[in-house]
Amino acid sequence: MDGSIKVAVVQADRRRGAVAQAFGLIADDVRDRVSATGAAVVAPTLDELGRGWASTDRDTLSATIDALLASGAGSIDVTAGRGDHASFDRLGYRAETSGRAVSYHDLSAASDDAWTAIETPGGPLRVASRVVAAGCRVSLSIARTHGVFRLGLGLPSLATVVHPDDRRRLEPAPIPSVIPARAVSASSLLESWRGWLVRGWLGLRSLDGGMMLTGPERRRLERIERSTDLLSALASSALPTISVVDGFLGMHGEGPRLGKPLRLGTVIAGTDPVAVDAVAAAIMGFDPLDVAYLRRAQAAGLGVADLAAITIVGEPWSQVRRKCRRHASDRLLRLVSGPDDGGTVAVPSPHFRSRRARAKARAAARKSLES
């Protein structure tokens, strides 16, 4: 086990105390990262539908900023690209951090020269220059399921610092990108019903061990493969230095937009963002190595997704694990490929086999029994 890869897991009754305790458990690692630059850029999660419970809580932001200042940060920039400038006030960020050396930047109103184009397999992707140039990047994400990446943890939350026009390539949405506030509840209910139908239909079709993929399903997987490639390229250029996953109140089901609240009461933090996402995935009931973006990140050397190579400080993840409701399309999403590192990383077997493949499998089984 590589003892240098530490991830803090804290379960508590109060969010602010849990975040502070998590930073205390990895204080030396945080101090090393922050003191090297003397400044930090913090990227909170802002819910594009304007819901406070689905955004980074002000206590999480405030406790994080206090920990960064105590670790040697002379200045902190809070940067987000979803919502609008008023979101910082509406969510209580400015009031909570008043008097501290903190500046706020709304990327949704940023000029063209505020973006840096990074090269990806799918073409240039515009990322906030402030984030790309930062020596210490801090990701504040929510524990939630995701309709593209299976889980919307620290690395997928980097979408918030991508240009709005390019973000659509990273997170292709099957529903309108803008929903009026008065329609959010109805849309969430409709999406839940649709999720039940999709979940049941996929489950029924895979009863015999597999099924033929339809044309739309194949095309959807191809789009998700491209999005996963983009996410890998984005993470390579803007990898968080410190990652915090807030699971006090997360989201499950039809995340990251129309899911339902999930109360875990847990905070996960560390200086290896891949390891933090892996531990958060395990707490939510997922095998980290079954999540394509985590396998790819590990293969690219961005971090460690193998739980056996991660030292947990605080609560053992197995003691705070809670099974969440997965996205309705999860049976499809787990088919997204991901290269391993040549070792024992397991790529999940397909749920969906052709009729001919199933017939061959049954024939082989009968032959084995007869022999």
Walk through the language-model features, giving the residues of each.
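Extended, low-polarity segments enriched in aliphatic/aromatic residues
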Residues: 2-371
